[in-house]
């Protein structure tokens, strides 16, 4: 026996060797290593949770981060609302131009001159309309059957290239058709409508018939655009449509305005930019005058209009003439300055030719302006310089 050799240990049945701890990694204590093993594994967030936490304030966000998220959320909501509103406007205009206007135009044929020519109404309906309006023109019967508020039809331009070609409505106030179309449905486009104070019964018109229409032209949508292109009488070079300010007038010197009882042509003689706010200068009440009790009242009105007109024509006027006023909104100085563009026409007299010598038309370079307009555009009014002999009753 080698007494220097360590004796072998004896193990009995069931004996278990004591566990030995692994040394902690370098730089960690045993306590640190143990705590690290005891931490549960983090659950991975799905993409929706991450997106929610990135957009909306959550517990643990700093004040600055919460404010940033709130501002961002408000901006997104505003963008969605604005975008939805713009899309609604585009659809509204598209529907008005391509559906409503087209359907109404199809129902109106000014060439229909006999009751028999009205093919889309039953005999009973025709008789009913004639009992209500004995003198109605056959061409208006179908439209009248659809909406009895119709009082006429306004057209500017040739049949194959209309600038305006729309029915004219009238209600008990000037608000109803401001936001309703021929079908009486709500729309931002509204309809062309006559001032509620104007008379149309049995073809007896007021001395000054005033028609209103929105300025909503959108060349991408096509169609009429209500009264938007009336502003071309004020300045034909708007949007580069024409090279000369007079070009639009020379192409469209007359307006067709047929009532339920009579067809008629009207000669354009003036175009004026009117102010509607006293803070910017004189507010001339051009839409408030519908009848003239005296020759002096008529002359005074025409003188006031011609002094302000940017357009001089060869059309003469006299007391007893019927006047047509077409009015639309127009903002050459921005919407802060609420202005209107109005075109004035005189009814072609019995036996008179509807022809106009457009070669004699001129641009008035120095019209009477309201205060704000004069300050922006410059130019001092030098008094009445137009040919007053054109006002025969003056």
Regions found by a protein language model. Give the residues of each.
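Extended hydrophobic/Leu-rich segments
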Residues: 48-51, 55, 126-129
């Amino acid at each position: 026996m080698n007494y220097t050799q360590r004796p072998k240990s004896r193990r009995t049945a069931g004996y278990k060797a004591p566990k030995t701890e692994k040394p902690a990694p370098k730089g960690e204590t045993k306590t640190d290593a143990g705590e690290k093993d005891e931490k549960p594994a983090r659950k991975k967030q799905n993409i929706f949770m991450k997106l929610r936490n990135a957009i909306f304030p959550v517990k643990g966000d700093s004040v600055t981060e919460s404010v940033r998220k709130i501002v961002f959320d408000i901006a997104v909501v505003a963008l969605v609302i604005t975008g939805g509103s713009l899309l609604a406007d585009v659809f509204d205009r598209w529907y008005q131009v391509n559906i409503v206007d087209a359907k109404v135009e199809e129902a109106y044929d000014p060439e229909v001159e006999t009751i028999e020519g009205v093919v889309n109404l039953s005999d009973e309906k025709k008789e009913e309309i004639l009992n209500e309006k004995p003198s109605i023109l056959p061409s208006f019967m179908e439209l009248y059957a659809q909406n009895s508020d119709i009082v006429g039809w306004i057209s500017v331009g040739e049949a194959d290239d209309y600038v305006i070609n729309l029915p004219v409505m009238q209600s008990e106030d000037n608000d109803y058709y401001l936001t309703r179309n021929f079908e009486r449905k709500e729309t931002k486009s509204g309809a062309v409508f006559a001032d509620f104070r104007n008379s149309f019964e049995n073809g007896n018109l007021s001395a000054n018939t005033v028609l209103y229409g929105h300025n909503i032209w959108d060349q991408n949508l096509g169609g009429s655009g209500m009264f938007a292109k009336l502003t071309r009488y004020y300045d034909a070079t708007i949007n580069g449509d024409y090279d000369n300010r007079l070009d639009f007038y020379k192409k469209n010197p007359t307006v067709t305005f047929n009532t339920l009882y009579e067809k008629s042509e009207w000669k354009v003689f003036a175009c004026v930019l009117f102010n509607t706010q006293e803070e910017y200068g004189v507010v001339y009440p051009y839409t408030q005058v519908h009848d003239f009790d005296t020759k002096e009242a008529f002359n005074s009105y025409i003188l006031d209009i011609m002094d302000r007109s940017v357009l001089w024509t060869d059309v003469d006027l006299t007391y007893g003439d019927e006047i047509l006023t077409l009015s639309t909104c127009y903002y050459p100085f921005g919407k802060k300055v609420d202005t209107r563009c109005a075109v004035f026409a005189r009814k072609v007299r019995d036996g008179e030719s509807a022809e106009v010598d457009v070669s004699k038309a001129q641009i008035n370079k120095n019209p009477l302006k309201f205060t704000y307009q004069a300050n922006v555009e410059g130019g001092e009014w030098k008094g009445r310089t137009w040919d007053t002999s054109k006002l025969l009753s003056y």
